[in-house]
């Protein structure tokens, strides 16, 4: 039988054993002081970084902390006292204005110290505060956003269902009008901050006489209210990101009509706008994390001696460090791109190419950098209380949630091929030369990409092509960062590394001969029968 409890306003879940449920710090009283939102951003971010350093480098054992479930009661409370989530809220609701570059910088500072905490704030910002601020009714925005900052609330998003993850448009959670309220029924799982969040954005399809409708509705659910409690049926033993609780939730709530988000056109377009903006903000999380891994790896390679010389003196190690350094530079370039193209004043529902290329690239780099750090650390890194081991398991789900990377790569390729059909262009290089996301980077591949593409490719080819195209787009953003005056040596290094990656990916794309699964593969496949007796 699954353990069952309901979340309350303080996020407690008393029916669950403490070993199974994450600890949410008690919230300060409503009269708690809120930092001055009008302070210059340099003052704000330096104060925030200082608080993070004080907590993670002096007051807690960060390695042990991130290997445990939940957070110490004081930690999130003290961090929230610097009001980091105010960067996602408009000034009229007590925030700093909702500027994208401020949110990215806040996430970068957080990610350097703790990837789990960084994701916690990313969930609150991109998946709750930004959509509520953009699509919420005036009454909902005034009430929810002001209380969110004043009372140190937490918010999250529930889309995924046990049988509908990637297939979210066929979700089974439904809503129907009930007087001046909406009744919502269904099951959601893998929503980050399960049992913690005070507010949820719930997604559902309208129940009609013919079954669930095609469009998606979004509703703000305030679990502090009696008719809006969400039952937590099970808390999952997630492998990584252990400070964030995940689980399965039974939804049977009634919310006021005013708490339904108001799309500009359709709910599906609103969902795409929300998800694309969230994916475009992944560099905020990746940059700080990648910087930390680079710093730690460099320190280790300078201090660790093998064969009478430091690890950093070995050629293969130098190549690894250069690649990790390139990841940081390109992730920063993507932050620049997002800060100028990802604002809530824009409709991002049609920006799948940039959003998918950004999300897939930076999350692949996060995992690759983690694997490199772990490899160089050797056995001592293979522990949950060591940054190398923890980074490897913590970064892995970033390649899965908000769109599995292989599916997103396929979508990148399909989008480009669709545009090529419209332009009646079959040569990949010529097409990329004309596209704003690839024009300058395409010149690095005049020969490599100058071939006609079959516009009806099998899925495996689409995935390989999409990965290569995503790296070309990454190069374009890196070129732009360089032209703004960023360090030329770091730009050249990043472009060199990505150029090599694209060459390798294109080779894989153009290689034939990959077969599918051979049926009945267990028959006649025992190698022992082929052992020859010694003479």
Where do the PLM segments sit?
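Amphipathic, small/basic residue-rich leader segments at the start of a protein or domain
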Residues: 1-123, 140-150, 446-535
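Glycine-rich phosphate/cofactor-binding loops in nucleotide/flavin-utilizing enzymes
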Residues: 9-10, 17-23, 379-447, 457-458, ...
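C-terminal helix-coil-helix/basic helical segment that borders enzyme active sites and/or dimer interfaces
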Residues: 63-64, 328-361, 374-375
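Glycine-rich phosphate/pyrophosphate-binding beta-alpha loops
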Residues: 112, 189-195, 398-401
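N-terminal glycine-rich flavin-associated loop
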Residues: 119-139, 165-168, 302
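A short, Trp-centered hydrophobic/proline-enriched beta-strand micro-motif
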Residues: 150-160
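A short core secondary-structure module
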Residues: 185-230
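Glycine-rich beta->alpha junctions and the first turn(s) of the following alpha-helix
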Residues: 232, 236-327, 396-407, 414-483
């Amino acid at each position: 039988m699954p353990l069952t409890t309901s979340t309350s306003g303080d996020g407690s879940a008393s029916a669950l054993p403490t070993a199974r449920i994450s600890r949410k710090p008690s919230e300060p009283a409503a009269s708690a002081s809120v930092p001055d939102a009008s302070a210059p951003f340099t003052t704000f971010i330096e104060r925030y970084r200082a608080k993070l350093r004080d907590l993670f480098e002096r007051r807690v054992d960060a390695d042990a902390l991130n290997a445990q479930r939940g957070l110490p009661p004081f930690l999130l409370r003290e961090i929230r006292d610097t009001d980091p989530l105010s960067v996602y809220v408009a000034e009229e609701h007590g925030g700093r204005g909702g500027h994208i570059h401020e949110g990215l910088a806040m996430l970068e500072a957080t990610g350097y110290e703790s990837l789990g905490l960084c994701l916690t704030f990313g969930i609150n910002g991109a998946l709750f505060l930004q959509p509520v601020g953009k699509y919420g009714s005036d009454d909902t925005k005034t009430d929810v956003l002001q209380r969110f900052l004043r009372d140190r609330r937490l918010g999250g998003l529930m889309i995924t269902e046990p049988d509908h993850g990637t297939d979210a448009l066929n979700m089974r959670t439904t809503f129907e009008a009930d007087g001046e309220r909406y009744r919502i029924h269904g099951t959601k799982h893998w929503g980050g901050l399960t049992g913690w969040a005070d507010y949820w954005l719930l997604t559902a399809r309208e129940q009609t006489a013919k079954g669930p409708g095609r469009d998606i509705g979004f509703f703000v659910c305030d679990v502090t209210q009696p008719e809006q409690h969400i039952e937590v049926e099970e808390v999952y033993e997630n492998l990584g990101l252990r400070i964030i609780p995940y689980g399965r939730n039974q939804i049977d709530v009634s919310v006021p009509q005013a708490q339904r988000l108001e799309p500009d056109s359709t709910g599906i377009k609103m969902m795409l706008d929300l998800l694309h903006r969230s994916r475009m903000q992944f560099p905020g999380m990746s940059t700080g994390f990648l910087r930390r891994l680079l710093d730690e790896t460099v320190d280790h390679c300078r201090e660790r001696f093998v064969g009478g010389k430091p690890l950093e003196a070995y050629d293969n190690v130098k190549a690894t460090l250069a690649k990790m350094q390139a990841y940081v530079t390109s992730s920063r370039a993507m932050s620049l791109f997002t800060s100028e193209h990802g604002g809530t004043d824009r409709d991002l529902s049609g920006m799948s190419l940039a959003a998918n290329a950004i999300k897939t690239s930076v999350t692949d780099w996060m995992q690759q950098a983690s694997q490199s750090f772990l490899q160089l650390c050797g056995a001592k890194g293979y522990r949950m209380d060591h940054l190398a081991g923890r980074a490897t398991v913590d970064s892995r789900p970033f390649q899965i949630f908000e769109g599995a990377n292989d599916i997103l790569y396929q979508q990148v390729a399909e989008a480009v091929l669709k545009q090529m059909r419209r332009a009646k262009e079959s040569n990949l290089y010529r097409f990329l030369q004309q596209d704003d996301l690839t024009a300058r980077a395409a010149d690095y591949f005049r020969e490599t990409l100058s071939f006609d593409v079959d516009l009806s490719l099998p899925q495996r080819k689409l995935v390989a092509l999409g990965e290569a195209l995503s790296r070309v787009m990454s190069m374009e953003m890196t070129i732009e960062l360089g032209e703004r005056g960023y360090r030329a040596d770091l730009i050249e290094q990043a472009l060199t590394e990505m150029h090599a990656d694209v060459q390798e990916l294109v080779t894989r794309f153009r290689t034939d001969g990959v077969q599918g699964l051979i049926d009945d593969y267990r028959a006649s496949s025992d190698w022992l029968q082929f052992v020859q007796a010694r003479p």
